[in-house]
Design a protein with these regions (language model features):
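Thiol-based oxidoreductase modules, predominantly thioredoxin-like and allied folds used
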Residues: 32-46
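Local sequence-structure signature of Cys/Sec-based thiol-disulfide redox active-site neighborhoods
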Residues: 1-28
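A hydrophobic alpha-helix adjacent to the NAD(P)-binding/active-site core of NAD(P)-dependent oxidoreductases
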Residues: 49
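Structural micro-motif
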Residues: 52-62
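Secondary-structure boundary motif
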Residues: 27-31, 92
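Short alpha-helical
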Residues: 13, 44, 74
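Non-catalytic, surface beta->alpha helical segment in thiol-disulfide oxidoreductase systems
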Residues: 62-93
Length: 93
């Protein structure tokens, strides 16, 4: 299993949407609780964020591979689908 590096912002509505998706998916699939997230606020740690190639938050990487990056006007169900893909990939790795 691999760690997920999760870039977020405290006031980002799309990040809150991703957080809800993580909570819901773990409640539905307890095996996802084993996935370790390294949550990095890009405002607080720009020196880390600058090492990764992304434009939007939330954004999730496994290693240096970008698995999910949100986009403007992303709907909750689309976010959830991408977050589940991240969780599955982390468990398989």
């Amino acid at each position: 299993m691999k760690k997920v590096t999760y870039f977020h912002l405290a006031t980002c509505p799309y990040c809150k949407q991703a957080d809800r998706a993580i909570e819901e998916l773990i409640a539905e699939h307890p095996e996802y609780a084993a996935v370790e997230f390294e949550r990095i606020n890009e405002y607080e740690h720009p020196e880390i964020a600058d090492q990764y190639d992304y434009q939007c938050n939330p954004c999730m990487f496994i290693g240096k591979e970008k698995i999910y990056e949100s986009h403007l006007f992303e709907k909750a169900d689309e976010c959830r689908m991408h977050v589940e893909k991240v969780l599955k990939r982390a468990l398989e790795a």
